[in-house]
């Protein structure tokens, strides 16, 4: 549920930036000072930045992995309140969350390389 809210916030920020850039008269007419001011206003209006959202997502994946590890350790110690199915489900959730995070990282690195290889 929180991932959906994070995505919605990111989409709102992107839409606000798009509106502001079109208000400047298109890509050829953007004044750098006005663009920076518009970006600052969008940040204030739309909440956390992309980096903050990414950090929150990484922290959430870390929490899921720690919970899975803790549950597995409890099961190995013989805690009767922990069932093997719960351990397996938590382990799979942690694995899926980590795989998704790696995919996002790979896409970000690819996008960064594309931007860096653009001719000026």
UniProtKB/Swiss-Prot annotation:
Domain of life: Bacteria
Cellular component aspect of the GO annotation: bacterial-type flagellum basal body
GO molecular function, one term: cytoskeletal motor activity
Name of the molecule in the record: Flagellar hook-basal body complex protein FliE
Entry annotated with the keyword Ribosomal protein: no
Pfam family for this entry, one: FliE
Protein source organism: Teredinibacter turnerae (strain ATCC 39867 / T7901)
Localization of this protein: Bacterial flagellum basal body
Gene Ontology BP annotations: bacterial-type flagellum-dependent cell motility
Coiled coil: none
Presence of the UniProt keyword Methyltransferase in the record: no
Keywords: Bacterial flagellum
Taxonomy of the source species: Bacteria, Pseudomonadati, Pseudomonadota, Gammaproteobacteria, Cellvibrionales
Family as reported in the entry's similarity comment: Belongs to the FliE family.
């Amino acid at each position: 549920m929180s991932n959906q809210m994070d995505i919605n916030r990111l989409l709102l920020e992107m839409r606000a930036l798009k509106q502001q850039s079109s208000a400047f008269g298109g890509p050829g007419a953007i004044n750098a000072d006005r663009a920076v001011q518009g970006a600052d206003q969008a940040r204030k209006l739309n909440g956390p930045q992309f980096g903050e959202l990414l950090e929150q997502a990484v922290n959430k994946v870390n929490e899921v992995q720690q919970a899975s590890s803790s549950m597995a350790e409890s099961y190995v110690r013989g805690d009767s309140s922990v069932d093997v199915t719960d351990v397996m489900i938590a382990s799979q959730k942690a694995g899926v969350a980590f795989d998704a995070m790696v995919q996002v990282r790979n896409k970000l690195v690819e996008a960064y390389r594309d931007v860096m290889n653009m001719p000026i």
